Structure formats: structure tokens, C-alpha cells
Amino acid sequence: MDRNEGELAQVATRLHMRAPAKVNLSLQVLSRRADGYHDLATHMQKVSLYDELELCLTKQSGVSLVCSDGDIPLDEKNLAVRAALAYLARSSRVGQRGVRISLEKNIPVGAGLGGGSSDAGTVLRGLNQLLDNEFSEEELIEMARPLGADVPFFASEMSAAFATGIGDILQPLESTKEFDFILVNPGIFISTKEIFERFSLTLSPKRNIFARPFRVHERASLLDYMHNDLEEIVSDLCPAIDEMKSLLEANGASAVMMSGSGSTVFGVFQRSVGQKKINQVCKVLSCKYGEKVFAVQAV
């Protein structure tokens, strides 16, 4: 380490953050908007599968990113980089400093789990902590909106939310703590844009059965409430969806569903089945899907 690097290490401020995945406990596509996006109604729940981030304020201006996944872009194509740039552009406290982001990817990419959006939202929250909470939660959510539909949820402190608009208008909900979830990912990247374009071809008026928040006193009916409008379309493109659902059902899941635009499927298990049963099911599924099986809980 040369002298300049040594001086930088002494003045840099670091923060470790965990960026959680999410599952969609319901997702209904309501209509297509004039801007090409779709209005949604979705119940999002953060779960205990995390990307790991380290944020470092540096003397050198700009944003740099290193990542454990060599397939992840390191420039402004990455939402985490764009989030950092958005924060720096708004901040009056950062001065001429820049940001270095170290990202360890554990959440599968293109999986319907919100990994990239979570990284971006977590960068906003982390930089805000490093800079002594310069912005309110509401201001962070507003900053997150141009970055992507799910980013406001991850920029918030909400563990669960009912989201409308394009997914950026949030109503906080209590976490679904009485269930365990097993996530299974087939290792197939699904383009959210492509799925919504295909869905628009089949969009027809429908009753908004699922377009409402799921309330605490209704938890007994959660399993009936689960629904994903996009699942049928993704299943046609990715037959593994139905296969994963069948395996989860055969191994005791109370309900199974695809998360977001796929390709991850999750099974819901009553907490009362116990960790031993969860571990057994994960072992069975891992024989086919390897390291893409995750036992998680609501956070």
C-alpha cells in the first residue's frame, strides 16, 4: 500500500449492509399505462436471503463497484451504481468524496426475488446512514422511484408492503412471521420486460379479487390469497416452474407460487412443521437444483 492509499484508508468511512430478497405473496396486473408500464397490486415480503454489501466513502470522487459475480455489470447498468450516483447528486454533505461498493451476490439474478433492486435500495439506505441520515425515509423512497419499480420498497424500512402503481406506491404491512418459505430457483434468467410485454397481449378486464392488502386478522386465509397473474405466461416459457411447484407440493408445502416475474418458485410451510422437516425438504430439492434452494423466513 502506497502513502496515498494509506491516507485514504484512514479517512474512509465504511458500512456493511445486508440486502434482503423479497417474495410476492400476491401479484395482480391491473392495466397497461400510457407510458408502457403496467399498474400492479402486489404484496411484497422481505425474506432472509441476502446479498452482502460494503459501502466506503472515499476521497476520490465517483462510484466504483466490485462484485463476486463476474457476470454482473460494474458500470451504470448496475442499479447499485445508479443508486449511489443518485444519492451523491442530491447530497449536500458528501462534498467531493466518492463511493466504493463491494457486492457479494447470493440472491439469484433474474429470479423474481428483487436482488438488483434490493442492492440499489440498500445502497441508498447505507449512504444515508454514513452521512448521518441526511434524508428522511420518504425522501429516500422518492429518490428510489426513477431507479425501478421495486427499489422504493427496498429503500424503505418496511418489512412487508402492499404496493400499487408500478409497484412504487407503498402501504406498510406486518410481516408474515408464522410461515417458513423454501425458495427454489432453476438457474434460468427471466426478463421482466419480456414477461410484461407478453402479458400485455393477453390482458383483459377482470375483477380485482387480489388487488387489496392482506390484513393481519385475515392471516388464516393467506394461502387462499396467494396469486400471481404472471405465472401462467412464465410457465409456458419455463416448464421447470410447474416441476418445482409439484416437487414442493409433494414434499408438504401448504401452498406454492412463483415470485414476481420468475423464475423462482417458493413453497409456504407452517412454522409448526419444524426446522427438521424444512431441512429434509431442502435436501431433497437440492439433489436436483443444487445450491439454488434456500430456506428463509420473513424479516
UniProtKB/Swiss-Prot annotation:
The lineage of its organism: Bacteria, Pseudomonadati, Thermodesulfobacteriota, Desulfobulbia, Desulfobulbales. Coiled coil: none annotated. Transmembrane segments: none annotated. Catalyzes the phosphorylation of the position 2 hydroxy group of 4-diphosphocytidyl-2C-methyl-D-erythritol. ATP binds at residues 108-118. One of its GO terms (biological process) is terpenoid biosynthetic process. Keywords: ATP-binding, Isoprene biosynthesis, Kinase, Nucleotide-binding, Transferase. The keyword Protease does not apply. Belongs to the GHMP kinase family. IspE subfamily. The active site is at residues 22, 150. Its EC number is 2.7.1.148. One of its GO terms (molecular function) is 4-(cytidine 5'-diphospho)-2-C-methyl-D-erythritol kinase activity. It catalyses: 4-CDP-2-C-methyl-D-erythritol + ATP = 4-CDP-2-C-methyl-D-erythritol 2-phosphate + ADP + H(+). Pathway: Isoprenoid biosynthesis; isopentenyl diphosphate biosynthesis via DXP pathway; isopentenyl diphosphate from 1-deoxy-D-xylulose 5-phosphate: step 3/6. This is 4-diphosphocytidyl-2-C-methyl-D-erythritol kinase.
